[in-house]
Amino acid sequence: MGHSAKDEAPVVALPKLGSIFTKLLRDLKYRTPQHKDTRPALEAAMLEYAVRSGAPYESEYAQRYFDVGLTLACAYYPTHSFAVKLHIAIYSWLAIYIDDDDDGNEDLIGFQERFQKGEPQPSALLQRFAENLQEMSIHFEPLVANFIVLSSLQFVAATLLERRSELHSLQHCKEAKRWPDYVRDRSGVPEAFAYFIFPRDECPDIGAYMQGIPDMMTYINYANDILSFHKETLAGETDNYINTRAVCEQREPFAMLEIVIAETIAANSRVVGLLDTRSDPVYARKWNEFFNGYIFFHVTARRYKLHVYTGLADVGTKWQEVFAG
């Protein structure tokens, strides 16, 4: 999952990436978000939920997952109602925990079967996640809630897949060109985060935005992959999306990065063009808030280590304390 909280690489700037990132933000027409700070109230509500429900939050790692969920909900969905924002924050916190919880692999293997049968889960983490999925239709149109749940179940399957020895022994090749996107669309949960942009009470017409979901998913995946590339390169990671796709397409990683950037910009342009044709401006506004908040989260969050690039470190300075995740 793109927001995994494991990050221990040393911090140095890579000059070539600095110019690439600066150009990306310029070409995307990124604007620093400026919204009312709801973080303290949301954090208090999440803590109350954790105490009441038994959801894990007291360990150092659990607190980091908690904070990422809190931070991204504030950044991505700033004008959502408090109840919707809280639901998304809890979902994100628990999903990120599941993604990093290698020790819970045996329990996770049976998650989907138990979920489908309505059986209790063996841990507080998985039980709370199952309950969160079951309550999606409170905040989202029933069909949309179904898509969110299905995307989340695919995320669980992809998490298990990424831990399988068979996956790690695969030799990437040009004959499996679509494999990187297949895995990414499932492991990153982009469909759920795209649908989260449009809660039922504010965005009741699913026809107004449904056609844009595939491009929103592309933006969500690729922008994360681009802005994670710095810390992953420093850590020596070669199993990320950019490097895997580069092998499949027989390109150099930096050349692949440039292509993915162009595809990201094009995907956003199509979404903006589509939503701008709608008579109700709320759909375009909601996307614009998410689009800018998504970049802001990555640029200012400590774990992405992008503060080493002068052109990016100054972006969002005014609001950095609010979204310090």
From Swiss-Prot:
SUPFAM superfamilies named among the record's database cross-references: Terpenoid synthases (SSF48576)
Binding site for Mg(2+) 1: 99, 162
EC numbers for this chain: 4.2.3.-
Pathway: Sesquiterpene biosynthesis
Keyword annotations from UniProtKB, A to Z: Lyase, Magnesium, Metal-binding
Top-rank taxon: Eukaryota
Chain ranges for the short sequence motif NSE/DTE motif as given in the UniProt record: 224-232
Motif DDXXXXD motif, residue numbers: 99-104
Keyword Magnesium annotated: yes
Record InterPro entries: Isoprenoid_synthase_dom_sf (IPR008949), Trichodiene_synth (IPR024652)
MF-aspect GO terms: carbon-oxygen lyase activity, acting on phosphates; metal ion binding
Cofactor needs: Mg(2+)
Binding site for Mg(2+) 2: 224, 228, 232
Functional note: Sesquiterpene cyclase; part of the minimal biosynthetic bip cluster that mediates the biosynthesis of bridged polycyclic sesquiterpenoids derived from sativene, isosativene, and longifolene. The sesquiterpene cyclase BipA acts as a versatile cyclase that converts farnesyl diphosphate (FPP) into (-)-sativene as the dominant product and (-)-isosativene and (-)-longifolene as minor ones.
Protein family: Belongs to the trichodiene synthase family.
Record text about domains: The conserved DDXXD and NSE/DTE motifs are important for the catalytic activity, presumably through binding to Mg(2+).
Protein name: Terpene synthase BipA
Encoding gene per record: BipA
